Amino acid sequence: MAGIFYFALFSCLFGICDAVTGSRVYPANEVTLLDSRSVQGELGWIASPLEGGWEEVSIMDEKNTPIRTYQVCNVMEPSQNNWLRTDWITREGAQRVYIEIKFTLRDCNSLPGVMGTCKETFNLYYYESDNDKERFIRENQFVKIDTIAADESFTQVDIGDRIMKLNTEIRDVGPLSKKGFYLAFQDVGACIALVSVRVFYKKCPLTVRNLAQFPDTITGADTSSLVEVRGSCVNNSEEKDVPKMYCGADGEWLVPIGNCLCNAGHEERSGECQACKIGYYKALSTDATCAKCPPHSYSVWEGATSCTCDRGFFRADNDAASMPCTRPPSAPLNLISNVNETSVNLEWSSPQNTGGRQDISYNVVCKKCGAGDPSKCRPCGSGVHYTPQQNGLKTTKVSITDLLAHTNYTFEIWAVNGVSKYNPNPDQSVSVTVTTNQAAPSSIALVQAKEVTRYSVALAWLEPDRPNGVILEYEVKYYEKDQNERSYRIVRTAARNTDIKGLNPLTSYVFHVRARTAAGYGDFSEPLEVTTNTVPSRIIGDGANSTVLLVSVSGSVVLVVILIAAFVISRRRSKYSKAKQEADEEKHLNQGVRTYVDPFTYEDPNQAVREFAKEIDASCIKIEKVIGVGEFGEVCSGRLKVPGKREICVAIKTLKAGYTDKQRRDFLSEASIMGQFDHPNIIHLEGVVTKCKPVMIITEYMENGSLDAFLRKNDGRFTVIQLVGMLRGIGSGMKYLSDMSYVHRDLAARNILVNSNLVCKVSDFGMSRVLEDDPEAAYTTRGGKIPIRWTAPEAIAYRKFTSASDVWSYGIVMWEVMSYGERPYWDMSNQDVIKAIEEGYRLPPPMDCPIALHQLMLDCWQKERSDRPKFGQIVNMLDKLIRNPNSLKRTGTESSRPNTALLDPSSPEFSAVVSVGDWLQAIKMDRYKDNFTAAGYTTLEAVVHVNQEDLARIGITAITHQNKILSSVQAMRTQMQQMHGRMVPV
């Protein structure tokens, strides 16, 4: 009976050999300790009992490769206890191992007469040991892991049909602590074959995350344990934050923390830090990519941290590596000198070439040259004074004083910037040579009392430092101290000394001396105070009287103290006055209109974002649904809940994944623009999210969406007053932008958003600046083509965008609103629109459009931009219309359907023509005179009722001719209405 069962097992094994001998490729996070299928030769496991229990059997696969299996089938005898033990298995540091068993098992119900003795399970045991040579099975040493049951068992029918029913069970055991272990299989009466046994442990395989390498890491002892592993930065990188990850029990890496950054000169590519390519550089250890060398610089090796400047170009010490290399400026232009006696005023113009820098300043070099040989010049010295200063001038003019008279001077004006010191070149300066005129002498520096008596004082003095010519005489002014110059006397002398006689004894006198040349008198000297005495004595020379000297010196000291005090007080008052003036000026400026700041002028665009937009924590934002797709990514609606404030609905613009630095900069530039605006008719920026992905712009939510779609959806539902109110709101927002010197460039109904209260707000501030800078982009911007139908002709032709071109676009928006979102110029091509505008055609009034509104549209569409109204005037006009609703009741047409012909402002006056022929000749369409006559249109009253179908019917098929005729018809109809008093003036 046992032999029959064995045959059944063998037959089954032959049927499954293909399934167990395929290529043995295991997951990367599993390390195999034992695989019975990979053992060459016999397994040689120990069985107990040695006979009649587990038996090793070899079968051949389809490649004639032997497969070693163990089987047992003692189902006829009760109380079976057959053991099979593996060889010693090293654990290699693993604390938890997994046992994968593949086996087949016979269904006991398919065996006759074995109901009491046949089993369908077997037991799995393990035993830890440091001894790898144990020869016997000691059952009491083993710890049971589990009882293994088959999910599927086979029958005699399966054997006949060669149906594979292979079971696979995996069990784990741990924690393990000894060097190795044994596994054991206990049979208690089953008919079973062990096809394969694999023992393995799990590890988290070597990986690189955030530029940090994490080594192979064996999982922890528990099924829920996490092993913290510190990573090491890859080559050419450094730690920003300590890189760590956790190895999970399933062999998967979890929760990366920290990261490494590529060193300067390297960027991340494919998880590695690779050197910047030639022509690129990276200055700092950041997560940025290598940047192309700035203008006028290059790199000739890989891994450059900065770029070398081209010859003749330099980089200042405080210039960032990202800044272009620059060069010194050229010389100032148009130097003009103006000599006034011994003063010179110099003025000049800025250099033609600033070297590419904004930090330009000017230095003045003064040289005094000999009259006989102008080439022999020497520096002027410290006696010359410059206003406001000699070096570092920010203005283009300077005043130079205290020069010598009748002297040749050469002045050099040097234009310098941050890199001038690297290449001082005479080409950076311009010079002028002047000769000073005659001038009064300078003041006398020192006056002394040589001798003092009861009735006289002997004075002596030095020549002025700058006589500025021949001294003709000196003038001495003196008076009694207590008279305070109310009564003084004058003495003149050609010498540098004089005796003043006839003085009163014991009286204090004050003396002043000045010199005169042919140019006039110089300034008086500082006052000298002397007191006469009763006893003759000499002040200077032999035996000076100590009392008189003390009085004189004391008086001088007191006078000096007084002068210093007066000077300090004067300076304080001057500083206060200046500070007060500056404060007043600052106050005045702050009360003025804010001016828009172009974020593209910032060297670091992120600085503009930080300055004008508020950073919002991403946790405060809840995205609810996608409401549209923009140029940079999806547009969603959601909610914003900032701590301390109520929750509000918001619109969320997201930046799509895989963006470039330029796309991120362009995306956030709109936030930098919106953040500067604060007006009820301008879309409000709530803030930005830049510190995590996705990058987002958060604005207020406008429930009714874009104005054009909203109007089309609600065609005919609003009163004229409501429509004018919408236009007034748009105009008010545009007036605010215009006052801030901001040009929108893309004003259209599609870029106006409407909230639940029908308040219209201007939006979409992302129009590209490339139009101004790139002559090749005549019709192309970053977002696509220029909106020809909304754009002023000078902006199309010359890329000249101004507030006046925005006014043109506003007129188109008015037409869109009054036509309930109809497409401007209908199905005409862009080229036809451009041609029609150039020829003077304009859009006709929409159906039921008040004449006053259409006239305002025509004003906005004046060809000369200076003839168009300002936004402030537009708002005032709309206010008048709203206050006078009767002015909105007269419309330009009584037609029951919209007019689709362009209006020609050059149509002739109705009063100037008397017949259909005259009219056609006036508009240069007299070729169609016979067509009109044949169709019965013989009077002007009949002509004003024709439409496009009528023209086609009488044989006028050219679209441009139809438009021209219908435009003139519309103008005549309007003139006829005016003649009959049907228009109400505003």
From Swiss-Prot:
Residues 1-19 form the signal peptide. Glycans are attached at residues 235, 340, 408, 545. Residues 20-547 are extracellular. The modification Phosphotyrosine is found at residues 596, 602, 779, 928. Residues 621-882 form the Protein kinase domain. A motif (PDZ-binding) lies at residues 984-986. ATP binds at residues 627-635, 653. Its EC number is 2.7.10.1. It is found in: Cell membrane; Cell projection, Axon; Cell projection, Dendrite; Postsynaptic density membrane. It is a single-pass type I membrane protein. The keyword Ribonucleoprotein does not apply. Residues 911-975 form the SAM domain. Residues 30-209 form the Eph LBD domain. Keywords: ATP-binding, Cell adhesion, Cell junction, Cell membrane, Cell projection, Developmental protein, Endosome, Glycoprotein, Kinase, Membrane, Neurogenesis, Nucleotide-binding, Phosphoprotein, Postsynaptic cell membrane, Receptor, Repeat, Signal, Synapse, Transferase, Transmembrane, Transmembrane helix, Tyrosine-protein kinase. GO terms for cellular component: adherens junction; axon; axon terminus; axonal growth cone; cell surface; cytoplasm; dendrite; dendritic shaft. GO terms for molecular function: amyloid-beta binding; ATP binding; DH domain binding; ephrin receptor binding; GPI-linked ephrin receptor activity; identical protein binding; kinase activity; PH domain binding. The chain crosses the membrane at residues 548-569. The active site is at 746 (proton acceptor). Receptor tyrosine kinase which binds membrane-bound ephrin family ligands residing on adjacent cells, leading to contact-dependent bidirectional signaling into neighboring cells. The signaling pathway downstream of the receptor is referred to as forward signaling while the signaling pathway downstream of the ephrin ligand is referred to as reverse signaling. Highly promiscuous, it has the unique property among Eph receptors to bind and to be physiologically activated by both GPI-anchored ephrin-A and transmembrane ephrin-B ligands including EFNA1 and EFNB3. Belongs to the protein kinase superfamily. Tyr protein kinase family. Ephrin receptor subfamily. The protein kinase domain mediates interaction with NGEF. Heterotetramer upon binding of the ligand. The heterotetramer is composed of an ephrin dimer and a receptor dimer. Oligomerization is probably required to induce biological responses. Interacts (phosphorylated at position Tyr-602) with FYN. Interacts with CDK5, CDK5R1 and NGEF; upon activation by EFNA1 induces NGEF phosphorylation by the kinase CDK5. Interacts with CHN1; effector of EPHA4 in axon guidance linking EPHA4 activation to RAC1 regulation. This is Ephrin type-A receptor 4. It comes from Homo sapiens (Human). The gene is EPHA4.
